[in-house]
Every structure is written in structure tokens, then in C-alpha cells.
């Protein structure tokens, strides 16, 4: 265990870190002309479909951890990959991914309200480091999303419970059977890791911890053969 992780065990350190993270997030939003801060309860939002009871409170990925996870990718060149965020909320992770030259970026969000905010943020986003300009917010239930048959990085920040997670992973597994390709799944706060690990076409690549933020990385079987 690193000394940084050990320090985060102390309540005072965690509180100071939380305050610093929130202030840094608001500064980053202001600098990039977007509004991605704030938690949202899906039960208080307009949503598509009937799975609102299976959604988890929206908490945006911190800028720091998001950039760390993207730097930690097992891909030397992302230009041939599509970035997909399932449960993309206000679009923060889409904008962080745009700092890398992905082929394109897709955000899937079932809340009409959050999708509208994400679209607004994509339009107003200003960042001289932006390397991908094809950002596509999609308003739909994740269980209905058809994964594109191309190399992809799929990001999940514990967006929904097992009722939704299972069909999503089953759809991905089926897509990999029909179109074998390199796919990486980054699952932050991997509460339902057993659901992902039950997929026959995915294997555990790494289990990581960044300042107390746990995430698992999975990769399609075809990439390791």
C-alpha cells in the first residue's frame, strides 16, 4: 500500500482532500466553460425507460482520477478506438477523453435532463488540449445501446445496479462474439465486478487503486490471443 493511500485513511486528510477536489473541479469547469459539477439523484430527473429505480446517484468522475485512468490505458495509440461512457451524466468524462485523439467519443445517458446538460457542455467546451472533436451524447437506456463493431474503450462509474448491468454486459459479450475486436472496459467502483467477470469474452487485465478510488480494467479475449 502506498503512503498516499495510507494518508487517505485519516478523516482529516480525507476531508481536506475532498474540499480541494471540489474547488479544483469548479475551477476546471470555469476554465473550460462547462458545468459538470454536482451530484444528481436520478429519481428526481426526467428519464427514458423504466429503469430509473435501478440507477445509481450520479457522481462525476474527478478530473484528477479521470485523467489518471486515461493515462493508465494499455493502448499506445487510441486513434483507432472509440470511447464509450455508459451513464455519462453531464459529460465530464467525455470531455476528459477528448484530450486524447480517440476516433470518436460516445456518451450514453438515459436522463433527459443530464443529456441536455452534456450536449450543452460539449458545445461550450473550450480546451486548447482538445484532440477529439467528434463527441456524440446519446439519450437512451444503456440496455438498448448497440455497441459499435470497432475497437473501443468502455467506461463505467458504477452507473446502475445488477438488474441493468447484466443485460448491458450480455449485450457487449454478444457483440464481441459477433465482431471479435479489442475492447477495454474500465469499471470504477467495481461493485458488480462478478457480472463483468462472468462474460466469456472479457478477462481481468488489472485491478487498480488511485488515492482510494478503486477501478478494474478488463480486456476482450481477442486482444490477448
Q: Where is each model-derived feature located?
A:
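Glycine-rich SAM-binding Motif I of class I
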Residues: 91-95
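Conserved SAM-binding motif I beta-strand of class I
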Residues: 104-109
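C-terminal substrate-binding/active-site "lid" region of AdoMet-derived donor-dependent transferases
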Residues: 163-222
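S-adenosyl-L-methionine
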Residues: 1-79, 115-149
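Residues in the short beta-alpha loop(s) of Rossmann-like NAD(P)-binding domains
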Residues: 111, 121, 191
Amino acid at each position: 500500500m502506498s503512503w498516499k493511500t495510507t494518508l487517505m485513511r485519516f478523516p482529516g486528510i480525507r476531508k481536506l482532500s475532498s474540499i480541494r477536489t471540489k474547488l479544483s473541479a469548479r475551477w476546471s469547469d470555469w476554465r473550460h466553460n462547462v458545468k459538470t459539477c454536482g451530484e444528481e439523484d436520478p429519481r428526481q430527473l426526467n428519464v427514458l425507460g423504466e429503469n430509473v429505480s435501478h440507477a445509481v446517484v450520479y457522481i462525476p468522475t474527478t478530473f484528477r482520477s479521470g485523467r489518471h485512468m486515461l493515462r493508465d490505458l494499455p493502448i499506445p495509440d487510441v486513434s483507432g478506438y472509440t470511447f464509450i461512457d455508459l451513464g455519462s451524466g453531464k459529460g465530464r468524462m467525455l470531455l476528459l477523453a477528448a484530450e486524447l485523439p480517440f476516433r470518436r467519443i460516445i456518451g450514453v445517458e438515459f436522463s433527459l435532463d443530464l443529456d441536455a446538460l452534456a450536449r450543452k457542455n460539449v458545445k461550450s467546451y473550450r480546451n486548447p488540449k482538445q484532440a477529439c472533436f467528434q463527441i456524440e451524447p446519446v439519450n437512451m437506456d444503456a440496455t438498448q445501446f448497440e455497441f459499435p463493431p470497432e475497437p473501443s474503450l468502455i467506461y463505467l462509474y458504477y452507473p446502475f445496479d445488477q438488474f441493468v448491468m447484466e443485460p448491458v454486459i450480455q449485450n457487449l459479450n454478444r457483440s464481441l462474439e459477433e465482431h471479435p475486436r479489442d475492447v477495454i472496459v474500465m469499471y470504477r467502483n467495481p461493485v458488480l465486478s462478478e457480472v463483468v467477470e462472468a462474460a466469456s469474452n472479457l478477462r481481468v487485465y488489472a485491478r487498480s487503486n488511485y488515492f482510494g478510488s478503486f477501478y478494474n480494467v478488463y480486456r476482450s479475449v481477442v486482444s490477448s490471443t
